[in-house]
Amino acid sequence: YQGEPAEALTQLVTFVIRLCGCTATLSSDEVRDLEHRDAVQERIQSHDVRAPYPIVSRTKPWSGVRKSAARLIAKLWADASEAEVLADDDLLDTWQSWLVGLSVSSIRAFRHTASVVALWTIGALSAQLEQVRESYDVAVKQRDAEARRTSSSSISNRTRLAHTAHKMEQLDT
């Protein structure tokens, strides 16, 4: 995402569309143009959507798709958090816009798949939030412990306290 954000978003939205059982393709301009998203979705939904779409299909080639897709979404958001990409509003706004748009579709494959992917996304983002909270709590405890041990004349202790405070500021952003 950091090198080619438009292409990464296009691949991500295309992945969801493929999970719906649709073979339509999107350009990066279509994915990022949120004002005309409804028209693009109508075009996508006019494509032939397979009856047993991959996320619910129990046939042999599709049997593991649901679990694999859930793991991929969780890994994607974990990696995005580590790379500090979650602060990019364009990523989350575009992702949310497509999921919301697809989740209100009249076609069950789109509606169901987008809703499930949205739930996976919420779960993955919640897990990332929990990790940040745990890191923040550890940093606060370290800062408080350092503050108790610090004497006003000790330069090395002040340096450690400043380092811990800096670490907390990083976690806050």
Regions found by a protein language model. Name each.
Residues 133-146:
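Alpha-helical scaffold repeats of the Armadillo/HEAT/TPR superfamily
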Residues 1-135, 165-173:
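Alpha-helical solenoid scaffolds in large eukaryotic transport, assembly, and signaling factors
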Residues 152-163, 167:
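Flexible glycine-rich, low-complexity coil/linker segments exposed to the extracellular/periplasmic environment
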